[in-house]
């Protein structure tokens, strides 16, 4: 198992654990462990569907039954900014549990207002959709994100918490889109911390820890 092997375990280190990987570009170009000591800061770039510059720090899945958890602090200003937990195979096949900001229409005031939202997104061969309706969450403060694989890794459950103790289950999803057979590749599935900012302003997200533990097999 790997308990809190992210930023919180490396407060005095200028580099992440060598087991972390990135997409196409070195993660040093979009991360910092010193801008906010004790946290891994990711500066948002393009979306995970992009074949160019993506802000992702990930670890390969090595067990069928695992639980992955992180804590993110992020204050997006628009829906083009997202940050959170990624469970992915490649740029076209993934799940994202992310905090963002969306516009809502106020029927009483007849105007648009923006509010922080939590979204669970699925990309199946670049066909992107929301798994569940977006959930309203506080504008400020941390949000805790968790994914647990079950049934020999054939499915995964996503959860969130606002206090790190009381977790709410969001959805159970199939993981077939994250396999070599479905994606016609050989990279294997990865779990990661992720941030994007399609406005080009490089809005950042702070991750307090990244924890991977071997989960008990469900009976």
Each language-model region and where it sits:
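Extracellular glycan-recognition regions
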Residues: 1-219
